[in-house]
């Protein structure tokens, strides 16, 4: 399949009278915009092509659903007050925009050299990222939002599926609630996993919908973790980072030293 074929399929599936579709040939990007609101979403077709080659029609179906729910979210009037239990943190790459398309500065905190923490209001099938103007309008502080988000995060379940490779145990958290990677901010979960492992604890958040814990007991474990993390990163609809982290003394350490580190005895 080629980019032009993906473009054709998307244009057919996303053709609505209330939307305008425009295509940037140079960048190979399809823009979907609401005619009334003048807001919309842009799809980069080259990365989508790579996913189609791996996942087939499923990749296109997922993208169509993502656009439909995202466009519907633009229509909803969102307020923070009264929806405090729907505020959650989301992990994004440091390359993620600091402002939304309206030019409002998003509320975010630095997390690691690879990641940032943004804050979202859950709308059910979609979400909206909070920005500083919203907080000012509703007379709320960033500290209040952070506390609400982390409190709500701790209320989420933590279903883990284990897989063992060459003596190393890998735990996958994949509940598909939109906040799997966000659970890396749950310090009690990290500490619990730290106590559970026999070797070195490593953590990876390759994309929004998965969090990986690894109990590394030999050098083979590092190689497997790197491969698995890269695979998930390439498949993710919202990729975050292909680099795992070591967890020691309550801190997530950079992974460029991962291959040089030995598991604890």
Curated annotation (Swiss-Prot):
Family: Belongs to the UPF0354 family.
Protein name, entry field: UPF0354 protein BH3252
């Amino acid at each position: 399949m080629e980019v032009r074929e993906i473009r054709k399929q998307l244009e057919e599936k996303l053709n609505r009278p209330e939307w305008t579709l425009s295509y940037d040939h140079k960048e190979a990007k399809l823009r979907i915009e609401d005619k009334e609101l003048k807001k919309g979403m842009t799809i980069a077709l080259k990365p989508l092509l790579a996913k189609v080659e791996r996942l087939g029609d499923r990749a296109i179906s997922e993208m169509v659903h993502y656009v439909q729910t995202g466009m519907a979210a633009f229509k909803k009037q969102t307020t923070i007050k009264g929806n405090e239990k729907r505020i959650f943190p989301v992990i994004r790459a440091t390359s993620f925009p600091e402002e939304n398309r309206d030019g409002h500065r998003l509320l975010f905190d630095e997390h690691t050299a690879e990641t940032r923490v943004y804050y979202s209001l859950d709308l059910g099938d979609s979400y909206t990222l909070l920005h500083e103007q919203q907080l000012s309008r509703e007379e709320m502080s960033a500290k209040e939002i952070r506390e609400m988000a982390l409190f709500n995060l701790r209320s989420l379940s933590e279903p883990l599926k284990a897989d063992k490779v060459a003596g190393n145990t890998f735990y996958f958290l994949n509940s598909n609630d939109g906040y799997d990677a966000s659970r890396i901010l749950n310090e009690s979960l990290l500490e619990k996993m730290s106590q559970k492992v026999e070797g070195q604890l490593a953590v990876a958040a390759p994309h929004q919908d998965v969090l990986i814990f690894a109990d590394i007991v030999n050098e083979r474990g590092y190689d497997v973790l790197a491969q698995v993390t890269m695979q998930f990163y390439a498949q993710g609809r919202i990729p975050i980072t292909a680099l795992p982290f070591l967890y020691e003394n309550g801190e997530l350490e950079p992974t460029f030293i991962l291959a040089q580190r030995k598991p604890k005895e």
